[in-house]
C-alpha cells in the first residue's frame, strides 16, 4: 500500500478512503507505480493525479455495464494513467489520443512494458475520430468538448467539460447525465448506445 499525506481540502475520512483504494499499489522504482498487475511510469504530476482522482474515476469514467473485452477511446490519454484504469477494469483495447509530444515517449514505454493492446494517436482530437470502432469514450481534453456540440448523436461516454456554458448546451442537446464538480462538469451517456440529439440532426457518428 502507498501511504501519502492528505491532499489539501481532504477530511481525515477522505484520506482513509483513498488509502483503501490504494491497498494494492506500490512504488517499484522512484517513478514507477504498480497497480494490480500493471506498472506505470509516471511523473510527479501524474502520480498525484492518480492518487487524487482514481476513486472519483470509478464514479465519473465507468459505464454501468461491463467493459470486459471492450474498446475505449481515451481522449486526453496523458501518460497512460486512464488507460491503466480501463485495463484494470477489464477493457480489451484502448485508443489513446494524446497530442502533447512530450508525453508520447512515456505513453509508448507504458504500452510496451505492460504489453497493452493499444493504438496511440499523437494528434489533437477531431470529431471524425468518432467514426472509429469503439464501445466507450472518455474525454478530458480542454476545448475538445465543444466539437461535440455539432454532432447528431453522442456515443457512450464520459466527458469532462471545463466551462458551464458548454456543459449546459451539451446537456440540453443530448439530455445526458451531469455530475457537477468543484471546477468542472462530468457529462455521461451511460447507455450502451449513442444518444440522439434533440435537434434531430442528420449527422450521426456511431461507435459500433
Regions of interest found by a model, annotated:
Residues 107-118:
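Short, conserved SAM-binding/catalytic segment
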Residues 92-93, 117, 156:
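Residues at the starts of beta-strands that form the adenosine-phosphate
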Residues 100:
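Conserved SAM/SAH-binding beta-strand->alpha-helix loop
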Residues 75-79, 121-167:
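Active-site segment flanking the S-adenosylmethionine/decSAM binding pocket
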Residues 67, 89, 116, 132, ...:
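Structured loop/turn residues at beta-strand edges in well-structured enzyme cores
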Residues 1-97, 105-106, 167, 178-208:
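S-adenosyl-L-methionine
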Residues 119-121, 177-179:
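General small-molecule cofactor/ligand-binding pocket signal
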Residues 85, 89, 109, 147-153, ...:
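A short acidic, amphipathic alpha-helical/loop segment
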Amino acid at each position: 500500500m502507498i501511504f501519502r499525506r492528505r491532499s489539501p481540502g481532504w477530511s481525515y475520512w477522505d484520506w482513509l478512503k483513498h488509502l483503501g483504494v490504494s491497498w494494492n499499489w506500490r512504488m517499484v522504482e522512484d517513478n514507477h507505480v504498480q497497480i494490480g498487475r500493471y506498472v506505470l511510469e509516471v511523473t510527479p504530476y501524474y502520480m498525484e493525479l492518480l492518487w487524487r482522482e482514481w476513486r472519483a474515476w470509478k464514479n465519473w469514467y465507468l459505464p454501468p455495464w461491463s467493459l470486459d473485452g471492450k474498446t475505449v477511446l481515451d481522449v486526453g490519454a496523458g501518460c497512460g494513467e486512464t488507460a491503466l484504469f480501463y485495463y484494470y477494469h477489464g477493457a480489451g483495447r484502448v485508443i489513446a489520443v494524446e497530442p502533447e509530444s512530450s508525453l508520447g515517449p512515456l505513453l509508448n514505454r507504458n504500452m510496451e512494458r505492460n504489453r497493452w493492446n493499444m493504438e496511440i494517436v499523437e494528434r489533437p482530437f477531431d470529431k471524425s475520430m468518432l467514426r472509429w470502432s469503439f464501445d466507450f469514450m472518455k474525454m478530458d481534453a480542454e476545448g475538445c468538448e465543444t466539437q461535440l456540440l455539432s454532432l447528431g448523436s453522442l456515443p457512450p461516454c464520459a466527458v469532462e467539460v471545463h466551462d458551464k456554458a458548454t456543459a449546459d448546451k451539451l446537456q440540453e442537446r443530448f439530455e445526458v447525465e451531469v455530475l457537477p464538480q468543484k471546477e468542472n462538469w462530468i457529462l455521461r451517456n451511460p447507455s450502451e448506445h449513442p444518444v440522439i440529439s434533440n435537434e434531430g440532426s442528420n449527422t450521426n457518428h456511431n461507435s459500433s
